[in-house]
Amino acid sequence: MKATGEVMSIGRTVEESLLKAVRSLEIGLFHLYDAKFDDMTETQLLDYIQIGTDDRIYAIAQLLRLGCDIDRIHSVSAIDAFFLQKLSHIVQMEQLLQEHPGDSKFLKMAKQTGFSDKEIGLLWQMDEKDIFHIRKQHGILPVYKMIDSCASEFDSYIPYFYSTYEEENESIVSDKHKIIVLGSGPVRIGQGVEFDYSTVHAVQTIQSAGYEAIIINNNPETVSTDYTCSDKLYFEPLCVEDVMNIIELEQPDGVIATLGGQTAINLAEPLRARGVNIIGTDCDAIERAENRDSFEKLLASLHIPQPKGQAVTSIEDGIRAANEIGYPVLVRPSFVLGGRAMQIVAKEEALRNYLKTAVEINEEKPVLVDKYIRGKEVEVDAVCDGKNVFVPGIMELVERTGVHSGDSISIYPTHSISEKVKETILDYTQKLGLGIGIIGLFNIQFIVDEFENVYIIEVNPRSSRTVPFLSKATGYSLADIATLAILGKSLPEQGIHTLYPKEKERFYVKAPAFSFSKLHGMDAYLSPEMKSTGEAIGYDNKLHRAMYKAMIASGIKVQNYGTVVVTLADEDKEEALPLVRRFYDMGFNIEATVGTALFLKEQGIRTRILRKPSEGSEEVLDSIRAGYVSYVICTRAILSGIHYEDGVAIRRCASENNITMLTSLDTVRVLLDVLEEVTIGISTI
């Protein structure tokens, strides 16, 4: 299994349900059409569909557009002809729409088949809004059917609805004041069930405040899609069209878009443009936090420093910006979640390669180039009511900047930053919450350099993935506090009169969980792009015991014996030396690739030399596969070439053989602290 999550859609036909599911996936596709298959021949497409992949269905749709016979597709793919006929019906509907632009009869047929306004607009060369107006003009509007959870055995009313284009509407609209909460959609790397935690708590708070609480979501794994959770549940795609249809029916007092992660917050501006009342942090505040120019101006006005950076719209602009800022630089596309396509580059050649191959860069899709500052990363989740700010806790991340915060071990309360730095962080958090205009939750990530200078990395004007962890660690239910603030109850009215409460005396540690052994092809090297698929928590009065518990809970094997395989980038060798020596002094056997082994031997550490694949041998891979290795330490220097390929092969081999893989020396340091604590006091844990 490779999937990290799933969506569910409900309709009256297979075609309708399938197309709703496709646009629920949030992969940038709104229909059974993927442009990457446009230039492939029928023969190439038939070869492609022999193997089951996540995008095979789009290749099959393209084959049907080319006129390929269903029986032939069935014989190649082994997909039942029943389903292929449904795909064929969708493709035939496309052709009918193209032949009858503007025809309301075919528009209704397309909507009953599950076509989105966006796709119909593309086929008719019209705007999505125009299709909506044509539908409204001809009365082509969805109705909502109730799921019968009792299979007609007896009458029941379960407030659990899906849309379809028929006649009778079964969703009875009440005259109560109501609030719609937008869910977070499918679980994927970068956006998990942490956001559903906030959604569910918000619904409970909305209900206790006397409102009718309505959820829109499409993920069957979540608590929010349990029909007993809210007053009404709409199981629909989180797209503007589908959400807007529900809003038109329910006429809510407001819509909350800041608790469902980036999925929900991306809907805020399109909904506002259609006259929807977005409550909590408004669209202007979201723009101030997420728009590069607006955010930089705000920071300058508040005298808050951030790493130098520029938004660039071409490759040459990117090269020029990096030369002005100075290498190394951190590059990433704007408006992403989970650090997708984010990298640290140290040379012009690597930057040019990144801008050519890793991202799409143009006027509409700028790429951010920032100075990379190596330092300690600190994170806060906070609540603002428009006049007051509350910071329940400050979290310190084990791994330095360069590792995505979602992949880093997180500690509350902080253990190695000074009171002066804490005061600065709290001051900046308060200024930013009020300056941006936050109403509800927000998250800030900071860098603290070796001179105790504090820089802002980013502000997320929404709930974050650390809200459940910090809520459990501090005892403050952040989602509840934030929801009451959104509904107009100030922090003092909630009994909160302080910026920062007294820290807990015990330590809470959040450790990431990875699925590298399942996700073949993914490099296990920790980087600015998030890769973890889960997390676990550990707590204890002693820091390293809390870390031990969190590591064990997250699936990390913590062994105080065995062999450590080491392969280091040249720039990491001096820093890694005392760490490897600590393993050696604890009785571990040390094995290393040639360059690393020679360095360690010169320093008096007995080391067995292993050759790499690029040297014509699989010694290092065979050693990892043999079953006696406890840890593999593998750091990375560059993003291409034989050394990089060797590193990928070593990391993949460790992951596939379920051996603890460490790519950050900060994680190695913490593991050694844990091993020393466990070895000395294991009986009391």
Where are these regions (language model features)?
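ATP-binding N-terminal substructure of ATP-dependent carboxylate-amine bond-forming enzymes
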Residues: 133-136, 145-304, 313-320, 539-683
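Acidic/histidine-enriched active-site and ligand-binding environments that engage anionic O-linkages
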Residues: 320-329
